């Protein structure tokens, strides 16, 4: 399978439909930071089945949906499509029915993800297995994101094993083994459950036999129990009938006594009311005296608090003076310490300068010695290189001579055999050429017909796209209008509901008049000021104690003052308020005070703002808190206006909804038409592709057959010539092999020269180490001298600052001592004020005592009256309770009688008389309830002693036996399934080990070669560690760049680590090439020279594999080596766009 196209729609910053074409070779992606380049890699991983939100750099999977920008609304879905070329038909069986496979993943808010393969719904598991079998997938090492190279470098050996698994192509094998292990565990669990059930069924069979014997005894006890229970029911009914007769007689006596007690209670209540009338004046006097005393007491407590604050201030100032003295002493000590530190630092600076003298001369001498040792080493290495090349050439000549001998003999035998086969091929190729010419003519005609149909389908698709785009635009506008209208309607509904709840909560029981009044908007404050909380009273009858009673109109109504208009035309009130509302006039705020003296009794004036002027001289301004009645009237008017507005907005929202739904239906219809057109276009393209492929195959077959015929003729001549040449080369190789010098003597001389070179290298390294040590010592002294100079400057600055601080502390101490002298005068003033308050408090206490004595006498008289009332009420209450108990007893007796009769009907479906006839006994001879209950209890205990009795024991036993036999057969099947699953898992493990070891050898060999290519020398290899089982072992990387010792990957430099990791990734490609490789800014740590090596390696990979590379980069060298470039831009804030340039075509055009 080959990846050909990646399509994004609404995925992260790619809000518009965007296609990324993936051709053969190197495809580059460039653009500024933050413009969305890495979103392309994440889209590719997402469509291949990635389900971790963190891998998508999000908190939840819905974060991949475009979230909106300044000029773009948020999307409700995101979709990514991946087009695969399956012309080779290498896909799994479920996907291998077409030359092109289109994998689509779509996510919708609050609905989750859905996968489709060529428009058919599939599972995420199927998609993951499809890519796993193709040696790729969401977690493939071939998809290298930013930072993943570092993760590979820092990974533990077992984590690196996943790279080897990808090379072996066993990712899918691991998943299948895991599924088999899950099925094995489930099967073993089912087998255990079946064995448990079989044991339970065996126990049930033995239990059922015992239960059958209990059934007969159970029936006998049941008959006796039914007769005893019937007698008990009748006996209880008869006793309940006698108890009811007695209870009715007692009730009549209690009702007479209760009436007499209630009359005495009413008389005591009148006496208590007279005593209560004398209390209010005495309580008022006592409250006034208490308030005066309280005010004076508060003043005394305040004065005491002031005295405490004054004393606290004095103590604070004294403490502050002491603290400032200590601070001055501390600053003096710090000044002495700073002077000592400055002296010590100056001595150390002089010592460092003395030690540094002569350093440069010693360093130059060591450098010269290191250079001389290096020159000597270079001379010996040059000699070694020449001798090594001579020995290699001699070894190569020996090997070449031997290979020539073997190759000549092999070529002679092969050429003679191939010449004979080529003569046979000439005859078969001539016949095949005639058949291929006929097939090509038929395929060309079919291709022309399919092309005409594809052009017609393309035109229909263009028309459907235009219609759908227009409908989508109109639907978006209608959706916005509907959303706005519904939002306004919802806001009004919420306000109406809140205001309605507030109005309903304030409504009082008894139908207050306030709820029956209608006021013109703007006049609520005027009516509320005129009537205030009187409007909360209900309308009542003429004899009611409180409320609005209806009265006839006045015989003659006094007119309102000139300049005042009646308020009545602006309000609608019930009939009961006509007298009151007719006495209210409406005036301007400036005229009210002037007209108030002209008011007649009962009249009042109000302003529209809420001011009030009454006939008796009272007036209230609108700036006072408005009355509750005025607020409620405004709420009622506001509620009416809101409901009217809500009806209009709701009608408008309903119209917008209908229009939006109509456009939605139209858009759905056009979308279906567009989809059908796309399907038709896709089908036509598929037919064109199939016809083109058939024509191409026919043309290729014709060309191939012609070529085969010509090749076969040439092969006959070539193989005959090769046989003659092979005989001549064989004679020549035998002569060359006998004339070569001795190879072993040359190798021995070369080993001696290597030992001399190694001794020179050790001497050079020693001199270099001495030079480096001198240089480090000099740098350390310079650094310490700079630090000492810096510290010396700092301590001098501290000394100057400390002197200024000491002067400031002395000044603050003088100011604090002055404040202390002023604070010491306050306690004497407070003592004089305390004496004056003591005299006033003594007078107030005498007044309060007199008022309290008078109030106590009145309250004692009231308590006596209340005690008498309570006693009368107690007796009345006891009489009422006795009456209630008698009533309850009578009701209970009646209810008990009814319940007894009802229970008889429920349990026997008979009346009491019918039950007595059924029992056939004399009522007087029926035993007592206690005796019958004893018999019933005894029979129940006997029945309960039998326990649970299964009356269907024999039928149950047969059913259990049948189930037991069925489960035994199922147990045999499960045991067989467990054996098969275990054998399958063992087979998968065996296959995985074999494929993993094979891949290890291939990857290890390729890794060493690529490492040497990238570094220009050196060596590297892979090592399995931590386990003898390849499936559990870790993978360690051992490498030796040129001029360094063999070490692990973690000990290399950053650039070397990156090149080594890339060599490993590409070695995996050579073992099991993935269809696609994405490298996200892997060249960032590399310099220009290493980037050039990296690009050379990419070119080599494109030649040796069919992998298609997608390179995300910022490096100019990498960009220049790409076959084509895609640029990701963000001209519109938050929205990514894709532009492309084909560099190969551009070079061709320039040429």
UniProtKB/Swiss-Prot annotation:
Tree of life domain: Bacteria
SUPFAM superfamilies in alphabetical order: P-loop containing nucleoside triphosphate hydrolases
Biological processes annotated in GO: chromosome condensation; chromosome segregation; DNA replication; sister chromatid cohesion
Keywords attached to this entry: ATP-binding, Coiled coil, Cytoplasm, DNA-binding, Nucleotide-binding
InterPro entries per UniProt: P-loop_NTPase, RecF/RecN/SMC_N, SMC, SMC_prok
Pfam families: SMC_N
Role: Required for chromosome condensation and partitioning.
Assembly, per entry: Homodimer.
HAMAP family (alphabetical): Smc_prok (MF_01894)
Family as reported in the entry's similarity comment: Belongs to the SMC family.
Name the record gives this protein: Chromosome partition protein Smc
Gene it is expressed from: smc
